[in-house]
């Protein structure tokens, strides 16, 4: 699908990343198409798996999670023994994102907590799987975006 994305598709992606609740009529106006053509393009992007969903952005601080950290985990187990860790990742909603990576660290996670003690509890749980390195997040310099985002 990527080779078939045209300038209009990229414009649609930029707009829906900026505002996932934008009405088709407004989206159509911004990308210079009719509402029906815009709706068809969005449907095609969804069916192709380019647009995978629409989510609300939740401010962790406003929901009682003022502490954010990046936790890196060196997991010593062989590749097939990662299921116990994956179960913990599913159970702990404070772990917002987890990426399996190359290099010294096997996993990199974005974690939120209600306090430093709460963060310590989460890190201690993760440390049962291997050595961890934790960095506190001071601020978000660049918000999460997709490729070609906000063009």
Residue ranges and their predicted role:
Residues 1-151:
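A compositional/biophysical signature of low hydrophobicity enriched in polar/charged and small residues
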